[in-house]
Amino acid sequence: ISSLVVVGDIDQSSLLSKINFLKSWKSKEVFIPSSFDFPETNETTIYLLDKEGASQSFIVMGHQADKYDVDGDYFKSQIMNYPLGGGMSGRFFLNLREDKGWTYGANSMFMGSDKMGAFAMFTSVKTEATDSALIEIFNEFNSYRTIGISEKELQFTKDAFLGREALKYETAGQKLGFLNRILTYDLDKGYIESQANILNSITKSDIDAIAKVKIKPENMAIVIVGNKYLIKKKLKNLESSTDGLSYNFKIKEIKY
C-alpha cells in the first residue's frame, strides 16, 4: 500500500541507487475498510467543553459528506461552498468579521478521502457573541439554501478557481502533490481539463441545487470550547427558542 513519489533534480538511475535498501521491506497483508460507518443524527447537537477564563469561544461544526473526487459531487460541492465560507469574500467572513466584528476569521470547507468525507465550518468569536454567532451562521446556511448564490458570486467563484489553477503546479512540492494525487486516486492525467469544463459550464441553478442537498444544518454536530459559565445559559435558550430557526438544538456538556 506504499508508494514513493520524487520530484527534483535527480534522474531515475541515481534515485534507484539511493533507495535500494527498500528492497529489504517485507510485504504484509493489511486490511483497509472500503468505507466507515458513522451513526446518523436527526438533531443539531451542541457539545460544550469548558475552558476556564477563555475570552473567546472556538466553534467547529460539521456533518458527513461525500468522499473525495475530482469531477463529481465532492468537487462540485467545493465550488458551491466557496461563496459561503471559502475565504475573506465568503458570507461567513463578511457577516461575522466585517459586519459584526466578532471574529478574525470564519471559514467552511468540504474535506474528503477515498474512505470518507465531511463538511466543516469553524470560527472563534468573542465570548459574549457565542449564541448570536451561532444564529448568524445558521441564518447564512438558511439563506444560501433557500435564496442561493448570486450571479456575481458565481462569476467571482469561477474566476477564483480558474485563476489559482495556473499557480498550483509551479514548485516541486506542488508537482509532487499533483503526481501523488493521480497515483492515490488512479486519476486520468487530464482531470484538470475536466474540472475546467465543469467550472465554465456550472450555473446558478446547479449551485443552488447542490446547496440544498449537500449542506445539512439539521444534521450538524457542533463543538464549542469556551467559558461555560458565561455562555451555557444563552446556549440553553437555543433549545427552546431559535429565533425562527427550525432546528432541534440539543446541548450536551463534555467533561474532562
Q: Can you say where each PLM-predicted feature lies in the sequence?
A:
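His/Glu-based metal-binding/catalytic segments typifying zinc-dependent metallopeptidases
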Residues: V30-S89, K255-Y256
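Charge-rich, well-structured scaffold segments of protease-associated domains
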Residues: I1-F31, D99-K100, Y104-Y256
